Amino acid sequence: PIAKAAAQQALLLDNQLAEAHISFASILMLGEWDWENSGNEFRIGIELNPGYATGHHWYAEWLLFHGRATEGLQEISLAAELDPISTAILKDQGMAFYYTRQYDKAYENAIKTLELNPDFITGFRLKSLSLQATGKFEEAITANEQWGKLTGDPVKTELSLAHIMATAGKKEEALSMTRAIVADQKLGNNDYRSIGQIYAALGNIDEAFKWLELSYIRREEALCNMKLDPKMDPLRDDPRFDALVKKIGL
């Protein structure tokens, strides 16, 4: 509410300020899932200042949330051209490659990001995801451990490891890890979505949707990636998948 009020106040003072429109759009998108108005605000901001890299960066997220992969890639690539040394943009361009199954390009962006900043937390996350997607599980685990050391969040690190184990065929180990985390009752933001994805990888579709519904109730930001996220692939043929996408408003 404070950030939204600040953005609205900035627009009242100067409604030609591109940065204010972009900030307001991001709040509407991630904080309220107001897709129509956030999209309008992004487009206004970009029209006011086409050279504002952050505008193209965040609008790319909006497009990718909607499954508009080609347009999303174009926007994030434009952001990278405008600000080639932004680790956040490089990482999210890598995530766009990941969402569009261009895993080698995703890995390249992870390496570029970490070359610019060796301690950039989500650079290791992107590296782990891209390695996992290409079946390089041991390397993915190493990158996941590096990510976990920097985040200081053992729950997210363990959930990510459990998903790697599930996709590597170590299903009993993955299930045991997941049940232990749930029993510990220390779940945080986006963890319910992660558990749903683990159960999807394990082939337990009913349990997966149970956790994704809990993620929806908690309005977890990461759930908005479900239209393109490869980890959702085991669920796409189930009618509950499209029903959940519709509930989110995408």
Regions found by a protein language model. Give the residues of each.
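Alpha-helical protein-protein interaction modules
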Residues: 1-8, 22, 35-43, 52-57, ...
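Flexible helix-coil transition and linker loops at the boundaries of alpha-helical arrays
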Residues: 8-17, 51
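Periplasmic c-type cytochrome electron-transfer domains
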Residues: 25
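N-terminal/domain-start segments enriched in small and hydrophobic, helix-friendly residues
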Residues: 47
